[in-house]
């Protein structure tokens, strides 16, 4: 069996780039696409110029205004992004049927069957990026490797408009020198916990035994052990069907303050709504999950007559569910919000602002 060749393609600051393409006056400017600061809107995408001010996705737009008061704030145009995405996905499928979309602007492609001695995977990735630019006038970054984890890692290494290959010749050096926070799937809480264990780099992670990582991180420990070694056997799944969309947050310290927890639930509702929008889905169930300081998992779910998609609707239901779940005497270490029973969303007379 030939060695797998996987490409991960990720569009560069997708929503902001579409806006800059359609309005050349925005080129080179700090462009922030997102909800309005007057409400509780959040940033969906920030151009690289805006990121230099500390603006990033999922940040409250009001906070972005403080960091970048002279930025160009743009109300999202979902149909424009959807049109560009359809062209991009069609290009992927013109190369291979084994395409796993992750969102409107990101996908895995298994091109193992296309690779020949005179046609390496890196050249195929170059062709794909060229075709995307010619069809949309948008740049993309791609990572090429022998598994999904490394391909995704590679795609983020030379952004924007970059191409990176990770193979057996350079994988060890790349992983060993990687900051632990740059490993896909390692969030702020996990990073802080790793720092407490003197794990700062890929080398430090590599030096941990699998048993110790499982003791520290539960089931995730096995995956972290493999990631430090560049191991990922997961296939590219072209018929991937999502049954739910959700977001969880593990706190750096156990939390018992309702106001802080509800703020986190609002942020999770925003993130979940944004992911629903990218997947063009809405859902008829909302679930809130908490994990106590004793690692006890509790959850509440509500089934709905009409599907929900906006962050406000999701939050209002999540608020009620959390109120039913909470015990004032019990600190919690994790909270999650999930929308399930998904169906195709209807977008008539709507913009992506409904989801941000």
Curated annotation (Swiss-Prot):
Its cofactor is Mg(2+). Residues 6-187 form the UmuC domain. The record marks 15 as: Substrate discrimination. It is an enzyme of class 2 (transferase). The keyword DNA repair applies. Binds 2 magnesium ions per subunit. Coiled coil: none annotated. The keyword Chloroplast does not apply. It is found in: Cytoplasm. GO terms for biological process: DNA-templated DNA replication; error-prone translesion synthesis; SOS response. Mg(2+) binds at residues 10, 105. SUPFAM superfamilies: DNA/RNA polymerases (SSF56672), Lesion bypass DNA polymerase (Y-family), little finger domain (SSF100879). Its main location: cytoplasm. InterPro entries: DNA/RNA_pol_sf, DNA_pol_Y-fam_lit_finger_sf, DNA_pol_Y-fam_little_finger, DNA_polymerase-Y, DNApol_IV, IMS_HHH_1, Rev_trsase/Diguanyl_cyclase, UmuC. CDD domains: PolY_Pol_IV_kappa. The active site is at 106. Pfam families: IMS (PF00817), IMS_C (PF11799), IMS_HHH_1 (PF21999). Its EC number is 2.7.7.7. GO terms for cellular component: cytosol. GO terms for molecular function: damaged DNA binding; DNA-directed DNA polymerase activity; magnesium ion binding. Belongs to the DNA polymerase type-Y family. NCBIfam families: PRK02406.1 (NF002677), PRK14133.1 (NF010731). Poorly processive, error-prone DNA polymerase involved in untargeted mutagenesis. Copies undamaged DNA at stalled replication forks, which arise in vivo from mismatched or misaligned primer ends. These misaligned primers can be extended by PolIV. Exhibits no 3'-5' exonuclease (proofreading) activity. May be involved in translesional synthesis, in conjunction with the beta clamp from PolIII. Monomer. This is DNA polymerase IV. It comes from Staphylococcus saprophyticus subsp. saprophyticus (strain ATCC 15305 / DSM 20229 / NCIMB 8711 / NCTC 7292 / S-41).
């Amino acid at each position: 069996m030939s060695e797998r060749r996987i490409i991960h393609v990720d569009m560069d600051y997708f929503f902001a780039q579409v806006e800059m393409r359609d309005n050349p006056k925005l080129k080179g400017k700090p462009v922030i696409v997102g909800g309005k600061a007057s409400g509780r809107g959040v940033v969906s995408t920030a151009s690289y110029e805006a990121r230099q001010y500390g603006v990033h996705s999922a940040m409250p737009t009001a906070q972005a205004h403080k960091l970048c008061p002279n930025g160009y704030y743009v109300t999202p145009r979902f149909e424009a992004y959807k049109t560009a995405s359809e062209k991009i996905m069609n290009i992927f499928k013109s190369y291979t049927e084994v395409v796993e979309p992750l969102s409107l602007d990101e996908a895995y492609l298994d091109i193992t069957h296309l690779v020949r001695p005179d046609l390496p995977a890196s050249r195929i990735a170059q062709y794909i990026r060229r075709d995307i630019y010619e069809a949309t006038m948008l740049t993309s970054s791609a990572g090429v490797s022998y598994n999904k984890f490394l391909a995704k890692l590679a795609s983020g290494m030379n952004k924007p408009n970059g191409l990176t290959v990770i193979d057996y010749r350079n994988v060890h050096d790349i992983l060993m020198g990687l900051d632990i926070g740059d490993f896909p799937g390692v969030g702020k809480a996990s990073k802080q916990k790793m720092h407490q264990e003197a794990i700062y780099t890929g080398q430090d992670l590599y030096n941990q035994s699998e048993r110790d990582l499982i003791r520290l991180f539960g089931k995730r420990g096995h995956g972290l052990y493999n990631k430090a070694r560049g191991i990922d056997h997961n296939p590219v799944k072209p018929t991937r069907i999502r049954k739910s969309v959700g977001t969880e947050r593990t706190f750096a310290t156990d939390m018992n303050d309702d106001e802080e927890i509800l703020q986190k639930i609002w942020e999770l509702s925003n993130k979940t709504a944004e992911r629903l929008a990218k997947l063009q889905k809405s859902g008829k169930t909302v679930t809130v999950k908490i994990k106590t300081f004793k690692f006890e998992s509790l959850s509440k779910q509500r089934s709905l007559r009409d599907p929900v998609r906006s962050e406000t609707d999701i939050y209002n239901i999540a608020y009620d569910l959390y109120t039913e779940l909470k015990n004032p005497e019990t600190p919690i270490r994790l909270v999650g919000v999930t929308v399930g029973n998904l169906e195709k969303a209807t977008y008539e007379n709507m913009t992506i602002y409904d989801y941000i």
